[in-house]
Amino acid sequence: YFKMFEERWSEHVRKLKAGEIKPGSEALVKIGILRQCSSYFKINKTLEIVENLLNDGQSVVVFCEFLDTINELEKIFNSKKISCEKIVGSTPKDERTNIVERFQNKKFKVFLGSVKAGGVGLTLTAATHLILHDRPWTPGDAEQAEDRCHRIGQSSTVNVYWPQLGEIDEIVDTVLDSKSENIDVVLKNKNVSFVANNLVELQKEIVKYYEDEYGI
């Protein structure tokens, strides 16, 4: 996990020095890379859930935050002869409509989508199982993604799965469950807590913890 982080962080620093990208909030960049690494290492868990559901004859929707994860899942599904199609930011509007229609008509079993591109405005009621491989930071985005299977015409209970890997996912879950503008996160099994007035402040606190604890 941390080896992957170091590789991706080194690549970010290289691009920064080469002028390929503009300087920004390094704390937010680090938290993004930590989440990308977490996303990658949850792939096997999501694959296990999908295969179990397919064995039961179910269709399933999988939403991810990161394009690399979507592409890796698509590659794995194709190698296992699992029928799947995806909608991401670059998918043309007409193609999106066709993909949704094919999924609704059960032409394929696994719908892959990015939270931003596939999590809004689509009707995916052919599935009663939805995997949020990566939970977005904001409750609104998470709810929009879940609502794709809860649309009008859905008469069955929808099951939502949230694969979780370690501290970073635990923190995101706590933020989503928080009902207050002030965020208070306590890590299980560790005497560590974060208190922040907003999400950006929280992210900086998290990065400081990872820097002190793991030397990233």
Regions found by a protein language model. Name each.
Residues 1-59, 65-68, 72-75, 179-213:
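Interdomain linker/hinge connecting the two RecA-like lobes of the SF2 helicase core
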Residues 41, 67-69, 94, 119, ...:
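Short alpha-helical
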Residues 44, 71, 75, 97, ...:
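Alpha-helical elements of the RecA-like P-loop NTPase motor core of helicases
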Residues 59-63, 71-74, 78-118, 141:
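Conserved helicase ATPase core of P-loop NTP-dependent helicases/translocases
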Residues 63, 113-114, 132-134, 162-164:
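Conserved beta-strand segments of the P-loop GTPase G domain that flank and frequently precede/overlap
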Residues 122-135, 158-162:
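A short beta-strand element within the Helicase C-terminal
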